[in-house]
A protein has these predicted regions:
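Compact, glycine-rich, soluble single-domain proteins
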Residues: 7-48, 52-56
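Intrinsic-disorder/low-complexity, polar/charged segments enriched in Ser/Thr/Lys/Arg/Asp/Glu/Gln
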Residues: 1-5, 60-62
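Detector for methionine-enriched segments
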Residues: 1, 47-48, 76
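C-terminal structural segments of small proteins and small subunits
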Residues: 52-86
Length: 86
C-alpha cells in the first residue's frame, strides 16, 4: 500500500471537468485506488464518489493505492494531476 498527498490548487476546487478526466485516467490501473478528503474516502474510479466529496480549492487530499502496479499508478497519477492543474 502506498499513498500520495497533494493540495488542490485549482481556484474552483475539484470540479466536474478535471474530476472526469482524472477518473477516466485512473481506470487503466488494476490496483485499488481510494481518494481521501478529511474523514471521507471514496473509490477514485467512481465519478459520483469523487464529486460527492465537494472538494474546494486548497483542500488537502490523499490517494491511496493498493495492489498490482501501485507505485507506477501513483507516479502516473501525480503527473496527471499536474497536467490537469488540479
Amino acid at each position: 500500500m502506498r499513498s500520495l498527498k497533494f493540495k488542490v490548487s485549482d481556484p474552483v476546487g475539484l470540479y466536474a471537468t478535471p474530476a472526469t478526466e482524472l477518473v477516466n485516467f485512473v481506470k487503466q490501473f488494476p490496483c485499488h485506488l481510494i481518494l481521501k478528503y478529511g474523514s471521507k474516502e471514496v473509490n477514485l474510479k467512481s465519478m459520483m464518489g469523487v464529486l460527492s466529496l465537494g472538494v474546494p480549492t486548497k483542500a488537502e487530499l490523499e490517494i491511496i493505492a493498493d495492489g498490482e502496479g501501485e507505485k507506477r499508478a501513483l507516479d502516473m497519477i501525480e503527473d496527471k494531476i499536474s497536467e490537469l492543474g488540479i
